[in-house]
Design a protein with these regions (language model features):
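Active-site helix of classical SDR
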Residues: 120, 157
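Conserved glycine-rich Rossmann-like NAD(P)H-binding loop of the short-chain dehydrogenase/reductase
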Residues: 27-42
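Residue(s) in the substrate-gating loop at a strand-loop-helix junction
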Residues: 141
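Substrate-binding pocket helix/loop in short-chain dehydrogenase/reductase
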Residues: 96-97, 104-109
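Conserved glycine-rich cofactor-binding loop
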Residues: 11-13
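Conserved small/polar residues in nucleotide/adenosyl-binding loops
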Residues: 167-168
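Active-site loop immediately N-terminal to the catalytic Tyr-X3-Lys motif
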Residues: 98, 146-152
Length: 168
């Protein structure tokens, strides 16, 4: 049975590095990306050319309600139940409290909080049903712990995520 890892937001940065490392450790990789199609294709090609692992990329707008859970469930159906979920997709928005908009607040809550919670719920449900003892890893930020200028929304959302994780 192949080990399957899901990494959200893996077309670049931290997520890309995590996906490459997991592939080198013997995991088949399913990852989401949003707009960096060329980078996503390059990552899949690199995984397939440097390891013997399968790689599948999914264009997912994690800002949309239900998108994260749908992605996890789709991967489970198409590749098998994951034993690792790495929640990494996110976006940093630095705005003064005077300039923030309801759209910015909604975007960051959906992407950096709700998405993480519902991806975890979907992955944990799949793992429990399949009797898989898996791992769920959530990438957060030091911005949850320290005050930064123009960071009320992003830092607040990451702090909410960190506190939620303590209670799971």
């Amino acid at each position: 049975m192949n080990k399957i890892a899901i990494v959200t937001g893996a077309s670049q940065g931290i997520g890309r590095g995590i996906a490459l490392k997991l592939a080198k450790e013997g995991y088949d990789i399913a990852f989401s990306f949003f707009s960096a199609t060329q980078r996503a294709e390059e990552l899949c090609a690199e995984i397939q050319s440097t390891t013997a692992q399968r790689c599948a990329m999914y264009c997912v707008d994690m800002r949309k309600d239900g998108a994260g859970a749908k992605f996890v469930n789709q991967v489970s159906e198409e590749m098998g139940v994951p034993c690792v979920l790495v929640n990494n997709a996110g976006r940093t928005r630095m705005e003064s409290i005077l300039d923030m908009t309801p759209e910015t607040v909604d975007e960051l809550i959906n992407l950096d909080l709700k998405n993480y919670l519902f991806c975890m719920q979907a992955a944990a449900t799949q793992m429990v049903r399949a009797k898989i003892s898996g791992s769920i890893i959530n990438i957060t930020s030091t911005r949850a712990e320290r005050a930064y200028p123009c960071d009320a929304v992003y830092g607040g959302v990451k702090a909410a995520l960190n506190l939620s994780l303590i209670h799971i």
